[in-house]
Amino acid sequence: MKLKFSKMHGLGNDFMVIDGVRQTVSLTPEQIRLLGNRQLGIGFDQLLLVEPAREAGHDFRYRIFNNDGGEVEQCGNGARCFAKFVRDQGLTGKSRIEVETARGVIAPEYLGDGLARVDMGVPRFRPADLPFLADAEALTYSLPLPEGRCEIGIASMGNPHAVQRVDDVDAAPVAEVGPAIESHPAFPQRVNAGFMQIVNRGEIRLRVYERGAGETLACGTGACAAVVCGIRQGLLDARVTVHARGGDIVIEWAGEGSPVIMTGPAVTVFQGEIEL
């Protein structure tokens, strides 16, 4: 099986993007792990698969696989690359598209010049939405860890996030605490662990230990989750610049019941073909 693909990234969060509309694609978890291997394959944080939409009125279906072979519900940086990919490949002439994901419909828009904006949908905060095992809904929760308790906010952006505030994101023990939060028993389906430093009301610095992928240079849904948690706690304004290790994105949220809008870069690195 020969597969044509594009290698892309959003803020250094890198992807192998495959057109499953014009070519037949059927990949096993083992094949995805091989493709994701940076020594033996293409190498990526996530594999993004473009498929035909299942329902009338939508443009495409968007599927995401981590480099461990597991399928996940959502990827914000990938959504921006998705919007650029379908335009560049001639799969659509639209700038704004409606895309089915495992957790609902999102609306990416390619703005040109390597920039895309995505309506990420309305965030959810009930513990059952992640899921997260808690007695009641709250703004923050105390999570017991081997290193001691930490205070987290939670949000679902179609995928689950736990966000904790830190004084210095560079000094945050992401490699140690990230896996402990990701696999904590309180998160039966695991969780993405965010570490947020608030610079001011319109600016944060962020690192994310992603479920199934480890720490990446940036996480779009993690940026959305961090900002909405900060806004709910009264710490941030409605428009926030998020500084990740891979670069900056802008997150906007008008409050409860409103969608989160994410704007940032989408870059094509190269195109290729691989035989499996």
From Swiss-Prot:
Transmembrane segments: none annotated. Substrate binds at residues 13, 46, 66, 76-77, 159, 192, 210-211, 220-221. GO terms for cellular component: cytosol. It catalyses: (2S,6S)-2,6-diaminopimelate = meso-2,6-diaminopimelate. It holds the Pfam family DAP_epimerase. Gene3D superfamilies: Diaminopimelate Epimerase, Chain A, domain 1. Belongs to the diaminopimelate epimerase family. PANTHER family: DIAMINOPIMELATE EPIMERASE (PTHR31689:SF0), DIAMINOPIMELATE EPIMERASE, CHLOROPLASTIC (PTHR31689). Homodimer. This is Diaminopimelate epimerase. The gene is dapF.
